[in-house]
């Protein structure tokens, strides 16, 4: 039986495994995937990821690898062998790094290889932040150029804000995935994200998967919030 493929990826941003379980317990794999980041993975390692997969969840392991090509390739092989659904690397690591990772993943035998997604510009950054780094180019132009590089290197898609998703969807077909963080409900605060959009607007813009954290995990009724978002994006 084919696993469900909901469009929502719930970001589990917790400091302890107990806090993470409390965020996850009200949810269901029928309506969401889960994103596990560097804090939880550094503290609890593969065992916690395996625990969640045994409950039926597909896992986006969000470690944003960025290093020399062989180091990143080795790390991605290890993640792939863990059995996660999706992983990511920084596109700014360059073409050689990305192609080395793609080749490494193609060389191993797995029932289901993970989706390899490239990170463009973090949604916590905007044009003024980039200028402090000496980058004068506009964010949308950088994102489009990086996404083109990622696709040519063999990646399955990119992480981008919903604003850039609208531009990228005109450039790439649906075989190239757009994963969008910075999703907020209309009544939510932006938090630490600067380039944000609502769920329905993001899907309409061309995003394939929406990474949503606090609007669900900090809701008084997380499952109800998830169901409302799922219904909203399906009625677009």
From Swiss-Prot:
Gene3D superfamilies tied to this protein: Aldolase class I
Keyword entries, A-Z: Decarboxylase, Lyase, Pyrimidine biosynthesis
Pathway involvement of the protein, from the record: Pyrimidine metabolism; UMP biosynthesis via de novo pathway; UMP from orotate: step 2/2
InterPro entries: Aldolase_TIM (IPR013785), OMPdecase (IPR014732), OMPdecase_AS (IPR018089), OMPdecase_bac (IPR047596), OMPdeCOase_dom (IPR001754), RibuloseP-bd_barrel (IPR011060)
Residues noted as binding substrate in the record, renumbered to the chain: 13, 35, 62-71, 123, 184, 193, 213-214
Segments traversing the membrane: none
Entry protein name: Orotidine 5'-phosphate decarboxylase
């Amino acid at each position: 039986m084919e696993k469900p493929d909901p469009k929502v990826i719930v970001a589990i941003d917790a400091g302890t495994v107990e806090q993470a379980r409390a965020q996850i317990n009200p949810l269901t794999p029928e309506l969401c995937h889960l994103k596990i980041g560097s804090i939880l993975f550094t503290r609890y390692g593969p065992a916690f990821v395996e625990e969640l997969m045994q409950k039926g969840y597909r896992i986006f392991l969000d470690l944003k690898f960025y290093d020399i090509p062989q180091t990143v390739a080795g790390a991605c092989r290890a993640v792939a062998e863990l059995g996660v659904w999706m992983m990511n690397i920084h596109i700014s690591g360059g073409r050689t790094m990305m192609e080395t990772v793609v080749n490494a993943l193609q060389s191993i035998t797995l029932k289901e290889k993970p989706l390899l997604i490239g990170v463009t510009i973090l949604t916590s950054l905007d044009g003024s932040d980039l200028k402090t780094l000496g980058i004068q180019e506009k964010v949308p132009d950088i994102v489009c150029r990086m996404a083109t590089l990622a696709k040519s290197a063999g990646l399955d898609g990119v992480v981008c804000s919903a604003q850039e998703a609208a531009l990228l969807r005109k450039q790439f077909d649906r075989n190239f995935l757009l994963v969008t963080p910075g999703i907020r409900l209309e009544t939510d605060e932006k938090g630490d994200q600067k380039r944000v959009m609502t769920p329905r607007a993001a899907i309409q813009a061309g995003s394939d998967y929406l990474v949503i954290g606090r609007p669900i995990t900090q809701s008084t009724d997380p499952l109800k919030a998830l169901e409302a978002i799922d219904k909203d994006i399906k009625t677009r």
